A protein has these predicted regions:
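N-terminal glycine-rich dinucleotide-binding loop that anchors FAD/FMN and/or NAD(P) in oxidoreductases
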Residues: 59-89
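FAD/FMN-dependent oxidoreductases across multiple families
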Residues: 253-346
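Glycine-rich FAD pyrophosphate-binding loop
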Residues: 20, 34-65
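Beta1/beta-strand and adjacent pyrophosphate-binding region of the FAD-binding site
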Residues: 10-23
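C-terminal helical "tail/cap" subdomain of flavin- and related membrane-associated enzymes
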Residues: 334-411
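Conserved FAD-binding catalytic core of PHBH/FMO-like flavoproteins
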Residues: 79, 164, 171-172, 178-279, ...
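N-terminal Rossmann-fold NAD(P) dinucleotide-binding loop
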Residues: 26-27
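Conserved N-terminal helical subregion
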Residues: 12-13, 86-191, 199-207
């Protein structure tokens, strides 16, 4: 791997694939294309001052990252194939053996899934953002066909011969394919004039970690509370859990103003102390993320493919935003690998196949998460009764439950 700052006005970089982004999805795409034999330029933002000093190694003594992902089997398979999964700090990865979804009201509904019923070893794996990115960075260091450029792009031009990204300072990166993996506010998407449907949920995800008095036994809990939003407690190694509270804006303001000890007490009451007393695990570390729905009108443009949040942003109540991104990367790699010999990796027909292959999966996940967010966000009593009855009914229909589990696991 070669790492450099933005090329100067006299520098024109050439590679098979240029990937814009600096998150786990961008790094996974870079690694995947490199391992498939393609030369790759990963265009990342300029490094922040002191970033190198902050990039400490993953140890048991390191504070637990409040940003975690519930990775499904598609993500696990892709990362294993790229030899990344084995590089994760296994002591900081927790398997989800079962999941319990709890309704609200006087007669709350319940829905339970477990790995045994799905005939798998785990439903998902909880991985910290830091742990994942450190493993990807380590793998990229040994990828000879990857060049990482730190700089800012200023424009994109594409033609039949390829696509060129112009850089601040006058340099450029030419490639056969440009991959936009630059997040929900994607610069690449905007440069390609791909419109979006945007809606705010007027909610924010409040995230932090706690230690718990009782063992969680690998169970992920989710509570649909109506007025207080959706609360998820995800298992971390040992007697630790990660909180993702999708709260209405007014409540999120209150939660962010409380001390973590006060938040722990509030959470214990809401969750009926299922895990016993909760104690702050990462002192003074709590973050919030605005929750929105973003539906781009296309996933591809001439010589350009979007992946991850650049291609779709969904409500986190199903925990599958990151998994959709990994599925995008897996599909793009497979589609490019299966192209006819005479076609370039950025050929319009190749990219159209990628977009078609991802359309249904993305649409269904957007439909499901948006529908659930709307259904469980209402306080109308008839709908509250109906949704709880629906949870109870679904729990008694094993065939449908198995299909839901298979889709959620990416199988």
């Amino acid at each position: 791997m070669l790492c450099m700052n933005s090329p100067t006005s006299s520098t024109r970089s050439q590679s098979d694939v240029c990937i814009v982004g600096n998150g786990a999805i961008a790094k996974t795409a870079a690694l995947g294309f490199a391992q498939a034999g393609h030369s790759v330029t990963l265009l990342a933002p300029p490094a922040a001052p002191g970033a190198a000093d902050a990039a400490v190694t993953g140890t048991a003594e390191q504070p637990w990252d409040v940003r975690v992902y519930a990775l499904n089997h598609t993500a696990h398979t892709l990362l294993s194939t790229l030899k990344v999964w084995g590089a994760l700090d296994a002591d900081r990865v927790a398997a989800v053996d079962s999941m319990v979804v709890n309704g609200d009201g006087a007669r709350p509904g319940d829905l339970a899934f477990d790995a045994f019923g799905a005939h798998v070893g785990a439903l998902a794996w909880i991985v910290e953002d830091r742990n994942l990115n450190q493993a990807l960075d380590a793998a990229l260091k040994f990828a000879p066909k990857v060049q990482i450029v730190h700089g800012r792009a200023t424009g994109i031009a594409s033609d039949d011969a390829g696509v060129t990204v112009q850089l601040e300072g006058g340099g450029s990166i030419a490639s056969a394919l440009l991959v936009g993996a630059d997040g929900g506010q994607s610069w690449v998407r905007g440069q390609c004039d791909i419109g979006i449907d945007y809606r705010s949920y007027h909610q924010r995800a409040v995230v932090t970690n706690f230690s718990c008095e009782k063992p969680h036994h690998g169970v992920a809990h989710q509570w649909f509370t109506g007025a207080e939003g959706v609360v998820a407690l995800l298992p971390l190694p040992g007697q630790r859990v990660s909180l993702v509270w999708s709260a209405p804006d007014a409540l999120a303001d209150t939660l962010m103003q409380e001390t973590l000890s006060e938040l722990a007490v509030r959470l214990g009451v809401l969750c009926e102390d299922k895990l016993g007393a909760l104690r702050p695990l990462t002192p003074e570390m709590v973050k919030e993320v605005p929750l929105v729905l973003i539906r781009p009108h296309a996933m591809v443009a001439p010589r350009v493919a979007l992946v991850g949040d650049a291609a779709h942003v969904v409500h986190p109540l199903a925990g599958h935003g990151m998994n959709l991104g990994f599925a995008d990367v897996a599909e793009l790699l497979a589609t490019v690998a299966a192209r006819e010999d005479q076609r370039s990796i950025g050929d319009a027909r190749v990219l159209a196949r990628y977009a078609r292959a991802r359309k249904e999966d993305v649409f269904l996940m957007q439909l499901a998460t948006d529908g659930l967010a709307r259904l469980f966000g209402t306080e109308l009593e008839p709908l509250r009764v109906a949704r709880n009855l629906g949870l109870n009914l679904l729990d008694k229909l094993p065939m449908i439950k198995r299909r839901l589990m298979a889709h959620a696991m990416g199988k």
